[in-house]
């Protein structure tokens, strides 16, 4: 039984079952600001033991994952030993896509909202500048920058092809710890 449900869309937890075993935390519609542009959106979730309360370290997660609602409805999920991919079939069931996520040792993609670059700390700016310098820069190879503005869409691509997703802290009010909400999105 689910003891409580935490949503990025609500100010307080919804208590469901006294003595429940787990807490479910989610961002139920990540990327919703992009609906009118037809960009993939999705759901981010985390399942935690109820005994630890709602604010506990991510290492305590029992399972976590993302659903992506786009040209395909897909699910990436982990229960702590690997990340697995599933696709919603025409029968209404999720089917194993036949691959376990393995991040490549090297990649040439990164996702960051470059429109915020004027607010970044110097180390972040240097890292991105090094990537953008391509083969002529200190990393001596070309990189591709991607940014959809939907964590689930950017995350799916990173998990599928490798890379890094960055939403760093910056100098704007309210962004001193980055933008991802730890309980719901990290």
Question: Locations of the language-model features?
Answer:
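Short, flexible, glycine/charge-rich loop motifs used to bind or transfer phosphoryl groups or to couple energy/partner
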Residues: 12-15, 54-55, 155
């Amino acid at each position: 039984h689910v003891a409580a449900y935490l949503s990025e869309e609500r100010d307080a937890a919804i208590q469901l079952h006294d003595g429940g075993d787990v807490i479910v935390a989610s961002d139920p519609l990540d990327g919703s600001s992009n609906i009118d542009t037809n960009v993939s959106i999705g759901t981010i979730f985390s399942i935690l033991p109820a005994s630890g309360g709602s604010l506990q370290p991510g290492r305590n997660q029992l399972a976590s994952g993302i659903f992506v609602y786009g040209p395909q409805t897909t699910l990436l999920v982990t229960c702590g030993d690997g990340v697995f991919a599933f696709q919603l079939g025409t029968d209404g069931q999720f089917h194993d896509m036949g691959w376990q996520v393995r991040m490549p040792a090297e990649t040439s993609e990164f996702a960051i909202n470059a429109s915020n670059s004027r607010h970044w700390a110097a180390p972040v700016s240097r890292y991105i500048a090094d990537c953008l310098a391509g083969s002529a820069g200190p990393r001596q190879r070309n990189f591709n920058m991607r940014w959809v503005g939907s964590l689930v869409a950017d995350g799916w691509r990173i998990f599928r092809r490798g890379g890094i997703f960055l939403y760093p802290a910056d100098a704007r009010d309210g962004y001193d710890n980055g933008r991802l909400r730890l309980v719901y999105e990290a």
